[in-house]
Swiss-Prot record:
One GO cellular component, as annotated: plasma membrane
Lineage: Bacteria, Pseudomonadati, Pseudomonadota, Alphaproteobacteria, Hyphomicrobiales
Gene Ontology MF annotations: ABC-type heme transporter activity; ATP binding; ATP hydrolysis activity
Reaction catalysis annotation: heme b(in) + ATP + H2O = heme b(out) + ADP + phosphate + H(+)
Sequence ranges assigned to domain ABC transporter in this UniProt record: 3-200
Organism for this UniProt entry: Chelativorans sp. (strain BNC1)
Parts forming coiled coils: none
Name of protein: Cytochrome c biogenesis ATP-binding export protein CcmA
Length: 202
């Protein structure tokens, strides 16, 4: 599998926020997208996910077969918002996402055990702390398979132990041949990563 961008430009509110971005990632590779606020990191991830239009250039994904014919189909997107319904239990939220996304990988309870929330799977999402909410969103990555993970400040709200736990989750995804593109201000505990510095001439 291969994810690539060539001479990519992105806009926000009709204004160009970045231009000339190119990268290529193969299986088990990670790209860390860094730079100051407003440099276009989140916009880049949303364009790759197919949530925003490409202003110029193109994004290409290959090797996903009929199940994942393009980048949008191949991606899990974890944004600033966790994408959960407060009134539903943690497990019910993950059941919804598993059924909506398809390509089941782990059961909701298995995913919650991995992020350390198995014992409170019955609690409404709205009862959780900020860190627990983020860990639930991370568990969403595990209930349905996607080869590409797009992560926007994924460790926001996590304590040190949860950061280390998430690093193990990411390593497992990479070991299985997955690809990660992460916008972050903080180190993610991964080795051998590529870096794209936004706002540095783009």
């Amino acid at each position: 599998m291969r994810l690539a961008a060539e001479n990519l430009s992105g806009e926000r509110g009709g204004e160009t926020v970045f231009s000339g971005v190119s990268f290529a990632l193969g299986q088990s590779e990670t790209l860390l997208v860094t730079g100051p606020n407003g440099a276009g990191k989140s916009t880049l991830l949303r364009i790759i996910a197919g949530l925003l239009p490409v202003a110029k250039g193109h994004v290409a994904f290959s090797g996903g077969g009929e199940i994942f014919p393009d980048a949008g189909a191949a991606c899990h997107y974890l944004g600033h918002l966790n994408g959960m319904k407060p009134a539903l239990s943690i497990e019910e939220n993950l059941v919804f996402w598993r059924d909506f996304l398809g390509e089941e990988r782990l059961s909701p309870l298995e995913a919650l055990e991995i992020v350390g929330l198995g014992e409170i799977a019955h609690l409404p999402f709205g009862y959780l702390s900020t860190g627990q909410r983020r860990r639930t969103a991370i568990a969403r990555l595990l209930v349905s398979y996607r080869p590409v993970w797009l992560l926007d400040e994924p460790t926001a709200g996590l304590d040190r132990a949860s950061e280390a736990q998430f690093a193990e989750v990411m390593r497992a995804h990479l070991s299985a041949g997955g690809i990660i593109v992460a916008a972050t201000h903080l180190p993610l505990g991964l080795e051998g990563t590529q870096e794209l510095k936004m706002g540095a001439g783009n």
